[in-house]
């Protein structure tokens, strides 16, 4: 089970703790984030580097993303020992793993879902994922939890007919995957959709969110990630409509590369668990970020582009003063810029280590702020 408890409610958000994730004891405080994996690894890091140089503040909950592994699904099933051992996580001590059918950094083009399947996008193109295939994949991967299928194809201009069809599809997928005569392993994290419509957000929540044995909820919000829709009032209203008919004690998750400002806002709306894809996205763009000294009192943060040759070529100061991560204690701005411009693999490794460390520190600061806030 996903054993979650709310320890404190404030106007700034919910302070909670995840005691177990599936069969694994984690003792993981929230708000926090899952550790985003691509092809079963933190992008650009080997497991040896991750264990020795990436010092996270809590026992990780790993987000295993399906698009990078779906082509190996039959091989993993034949392998018979689960996805963790297949991708080399066997050396980790009882990792807590969540299976997501989508990659938060992947594309989700419109127009490819149908009544029998959801389109996911891999390096080789579109794969249509139906319920039977997904159930078999969930069972063979052996993760502690899995996310249910949701029809995400609801752009802002979607009409009532399209919205209703998408919600009905999501409901049907849920009914089919949990058929009584079909076995499925792992805790269910119910994915809630509905696009930009408050009515359909609530309808989806009522139709599938009240089912028994629901371990947690995740909100489909890919239209609101950085660079796309960011209307905070609209986000607030959609989340209120989604969660108001649901049990308030369940864990609430969201997936996507949300920046520190948006994370702080979503925490205030009651979201408990995010993912670390924002840190990876920045690193793959040659960027590093640093929170303002007064975060989260203010939501400010700085993003530095280390591809800027003129600015950093002769700068031999630490990457970020005061940061205790491996990157900032061992390397300089000038050297990092040199690595990026010569396309050295070490550049991405160092940026991922720093950004992951800073994203982890961000949640630690948010939790400390909630601890010091007046309870409701």
From Swiss-Prot:
Transmembrane portions of the chain: none
A GO MF term: tRNA-guanosine(34) queuine transglycosylase activity
Primary location group: cytoplasm
Entry cofactors: Zn(2+)
UniProt: Zn(2+) binding residues: 323, 325, 328, 354
GO BP: any one term: tRNA-guanine transglycosylation
Keywords assigned: Cytoplasm, Metal-binding, tRNA processing, Zinc
Localization in the cell: Cytoplasm
Domain of life of the organism encoding this protein: Eukaryota
Cofactor binding note of this UniProt entry: Binds 1 zinc ion per subunit.
Assigned GO CC terms: cytoplasm
Record has Signal as a keyword: no
Pfam families: TGT (PF01702)
Summary of the function given for this chain in its UniProt record: Non-catalytic subunit of the queuine tRNA-ribosyltransferase (TGT) that catalyzes the base-exchange of a guanine (G) residue with queuine (Q) at position 34 (anticodon wobble position) in tRNAs with GU(N) anticodons (tRNA-Asp, -Asn, -His and -Tyr), resulting in the hypermodified nucleoside queuosine (7-(((4,5-cis-dihydroxy-2-cyclopenten-1-yl)amino)methyl)-7-deazaguanosine).
Subunit structure: Heterodimer of a catalytic subunit and an accessory subunit.
NCBIfam families in alphabetical order: tgt_general
Protein family per UniProt: Belongs to the queuine tRNA-ribosyltransferase family. QTRT2 subfamily.
Name of the protein in question: Queuine tRNA-ribosyltransferase accessory subunit 2
Protein source organism: Caenorhabditis briggsae
GN (gene name): tgt-2
């Amino acid at each position: 089970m996903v054993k979650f408890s709310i320890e404190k409610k404030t106007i700034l958000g919910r302070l909670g703790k995840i005691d177990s994730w599936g069969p694994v004891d984690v003792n993981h405080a929230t708000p926090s984030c899952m550790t985003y994996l691509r092809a079963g690894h933190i992008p650009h890091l080997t497991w040896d580097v991750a264990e020795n140089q990436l010092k996270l503040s809590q026992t990780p909950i790993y987000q295993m993303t399906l698009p990078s592994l779906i082509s190996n699904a039959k091989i993993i099933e034949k392998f018979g020992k689960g996805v963790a051992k297949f991708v080399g996580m066997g050396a980790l001590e009882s990792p807590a793993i969540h299976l997501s059918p989508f990659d938060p950094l992947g594309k989700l083009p419109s127009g490819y879902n149908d009544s029998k399947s959801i389109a996911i996008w891999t390096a080789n193109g579109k794969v249509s994922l139906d319920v039977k295939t997904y159930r078999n994949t969930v069972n063979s991967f052996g993760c502690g939890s899995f996310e249910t299928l949701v029809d995400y194809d609801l752009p802002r201009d979607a009409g009532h007919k399209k919205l209703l069809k998408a919600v009905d599809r999501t409901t049907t997928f849920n009914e089919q995957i949990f058929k009584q005569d079909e076995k499925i392993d792992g805790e269910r994290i119910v994915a809630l959709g509905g696009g930009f419509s408050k009515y359909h957000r609530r309808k989806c929540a009522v139709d599938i969110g009240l089912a028994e044995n629901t371990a947690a909820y995740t909100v489909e919000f890919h239209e609101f990630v950085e660079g796309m829709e960011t209307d905070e009032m609209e986000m607030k209203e959609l989340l209120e409509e989604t969660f108001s008919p649901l049990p308030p004690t369940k864990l609430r998750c969201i997936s996507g590369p949300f920046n520190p400002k948006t994370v702080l806002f979503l925490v205030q709306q009651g979201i408990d668990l995010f993912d670390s894809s924002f840190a990876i996205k920045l690193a793959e763009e040659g960027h590093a970020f640093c929170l303002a000294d007064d975060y989260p009192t203010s939501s400010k943060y700085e993003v530095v582009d280390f591809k800027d040759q003129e600015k950093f070529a002769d700068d031999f100061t630490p990457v970020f003063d005061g940061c205790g991560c491996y990157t900032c204690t061992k390397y300089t701005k000038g050297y990092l810029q040199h690595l990026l411009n010569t396309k050295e693999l070490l550049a991405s490794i160092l940026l991922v280590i720093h950004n992951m460390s800073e994203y982890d520190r961000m949640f630690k600061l948010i939790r400390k702020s909630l601890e010091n806030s007046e309870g409701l």
